[in-house]
Amino acid sequence: MSEKKIEQWEVERYWEIFSSLSNGQPHLNNAQAATVLRNSRLRDDQLEKVWDLADVDGDGELDFEEFCVAMRLIFDLVNGEYADVPHSLPDWLIPESKAHLVQASRALTGRQPQFERVEEEDDTPGLKDGFDWYMSPGDKSKYEEIYSANRNHRGEITFDSLQPLYDSLAVPDTDIRSAWNLVNPSASSTISKDATLAFLHILNNRHEGYRIPRTVPASLRASFESNKIDYQLDNVRPAQRWGADTDVDTSTGRKAKFGDAYLSRLGVGGRTTYRPQGTDFSNTIQDQEWEKVRLRRELAELEKKLEAADGAMESRKGGGGSVNGGPNWTLIKKEALQLLEYKERELRELREGTGKVKEGESLERLREDVKTVGDQVEGLRAHLAKRNETLTELKDQIREEKRSR
């Protein structure tokens, strides 16, 4: 089993790139990502393949998880981990939240089926639009437990086997049957694991007040129709072992979380045989927190530079290195020039608001920094002038000494 994964420091670096390109939006389109992707100097056909692999949900854009996948693929290609773009995503690189989509797409037979349409029109008042096919790690783990507790010897689920679950939900029977028909286009007596997870996800959202969707993604529908995937735990392959963290907030403030009471009666609540093998982005720091971290880090770096410059200036006042017991004026002059150049650059960045100086620092602090650096620059110039005079005097003394001999 591969031990490779995307490290947290990589996620942080990718987030800085993603947030700078997305302008606060949750997705990147091709035009927004083009510059950073082409900086890799990979061929255009390779970048197209990387994009297709990373765009797991097939919406033509990259969310943050998919962007991380694309960047890691590119870095591995550049560093020689792959001779060419792989034909499919490695299991360890698949985001856990989208593992069901990847597995469903692997069931495609080459044709692109149309979306399934539900004939019933849902006119129930008070329901919300915006059904999302995304399964959080906690929800997916719960669906896995319900499936494992009710599957038959072929790894399939019948409609009636979940009757106790239906009884625990605030979902009308007509909506439950509509959801079943949506994931069971062949009208068979049983459904596969993929279809079961989708069915439970629809019921969960309906339980939370969302309308039953009218269509399903094409890749999911293909897996429902094939109904040939072996999901029995004894025969499970590494590529199928996707799971999720079982830690989930169970409070809604108005009713029990989907399936909690049912799983509690079954005695399997909180336990799952699944363990994650892909990359879990569920604990990724949110936008506001990332912005705070970035600004604090930049402020600390700026203060550290100023402190280092102040310390260097103080050490110069105490005298530089020595040659034969005397001051090394050449070294002092060189270091003073370097420090002067550094301070002038810092002063320019502070005045222009460039470099490490960002909008997160207060105007009053910037003014104080500008004044402090300006005073230090003037002091260094005066100090350098005095040292040059001293150096000239020493050279004159050396010449006089040589002539006297």
UniProtKB/Swiss-Prot annotation:
Keywords: Actin-binding, Calcium, Cell membrane, Coiled coil, Cytoplasm, Cytoskeleton, Endocytosis, Endosome, Membrane, Metal-binding, Repeat. It is a peripheral membrane protein. Its main location: membrane. Residues 280-405 form a coiled coil. GO terms for molecular function: actin binding; calcium ion binding. Residues 42-77 form the EF-hand domain. It is found in: Cell membrane; Endosome membrane; Cytoplasm, Cytoskeleton, Actin patch. This is Actin cytoskeleton-regulatory complex protein END3. It comes from Ajellomyces capsulatus (strain NAm1 / WU24).
